[in-house]
Design a protein with these regions (language model features):
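Conserved N-terminal phosphate-binding loop of PLP-dependent enzymes in the Aspartate aminotransferase
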Residues: 10-266
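Single conserved hydrophobic/aromatic residue that forms the stacking wall/gate
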Residues: 1-12
Length: 266
């Protein structure tokens, strides 16, 4: 009921915010007002409450419901696009999205945002349609060159995704071993190269469960990791990202640093 920012007027009142991973909430909303719901926008893997994977069948069920009611299914791949696979989360989870948004990796290190969708939707965008969309830096040559080079490299080196998956699995396993060894309650959520450590003894499946994490312990975790040369995102509710550039030595150093933090927190 509270606008997240000034200047939004009543726009936010026409939005429904539903709990992640709760298909019953989606079904209930559509049963009550399905003909009024223009679209559903969702992160296929939540990244701004910490990393929260979708439950099996959750995303596919949303696609089924939106198709039934003629509602647009919008997948926010700003974090997951080209990170979880060469075809992003929609490829990893086999999704049939109507519109997909991109950012981050698609720019190859440069600031880029992009969106795409099915022909019948994109034909509404100028110059073929009435919806005008342009900007002074749209299609910036430097950003486009960096993005094209990045995507081309990933397409030509598909092994990268398997290597990153192995790196993520190693770090997840080592973190869990250390937490268990020292009796520290943590939950490690990971999808591919995205991972979060939650200081809680409950499974983290949505914002409500994520918000119950012990943020005081996270502060200790962040600061003690930093002292050992490991710089993490400074929030319980952001993701840790792995890349192909991380070496075996990097991962071992990170795992050893985490082990020391668990010893402090026991």
């Amino acid at each position: 009921d509270v606008a997240p920012s000034r200047g939004l007027g009543d726009v936010y009142k026409r939005q429904l915010v539903l709990p992640y991973n709760d298909i019953d909430a989606i079904e209930d909303a559509f049963e009550k007002m399905g003909n009024e719901i223009a679209g559903v926008i969702i992160e296929p893997v939540a990244g701004n409450m910490g990393v929260v994977p979708p439950k099996d069948g959750y995303l596919q069920k949303i696609r089924e419901i939106t198709k039934k009611y003629g509602s647009v299914f919008i997948v926010d791949e700003v974090m997951t696009g080209f990170r979880l696979s060469a075809s992003g989360a929609i490829g990893r989870f086999g999704l049939d999205a109507d519109i997909v948004t991109f950012g981050k990796i698609i720019g190859g290190g440069m600031p880029v945002g992009a969106y795409g969708g099915k022909r019948e939707i994109m034909e509404f965008v100028s110059p073929t349609g009435p919806v005008y969309q342009a900007g002074t830096l749209s299609g910036n040559p430097l950003a486009m060159a960096a993005g094209n080079a990045q995507i081309k490299y990933l397409q030509e080196n598909p092994y990268i995704y398997e290597e990153i998956e192995q790196k993520g699995a190693y770090l997840e396993s080592e973190f869990k071993k250390s937490a268990e060894k020292y009796g520290v309650n943590v939950r490690v959520n990971r999808v591919g190269s995205m991972m979060s450590v939650f200081f809680t003894d409950n499974d983290v499946t949505n914002f409500e469960t994520a918000s119950k994490s012990n943020t005081e312990k996270f502060k200790v975790y962040f600061n003690e990791m930093l002292k050992q040369g490991i710089y993490l995102a400074p929030s319980q509710f952001e993701s840790l990202f792995l890349s192909d550039a991380h070496t075996k030595a990097d991962l071992e150093k990170t795992a050893a640093a985490f082990d020391k933090v668990m010893e402090i927190l026991r």
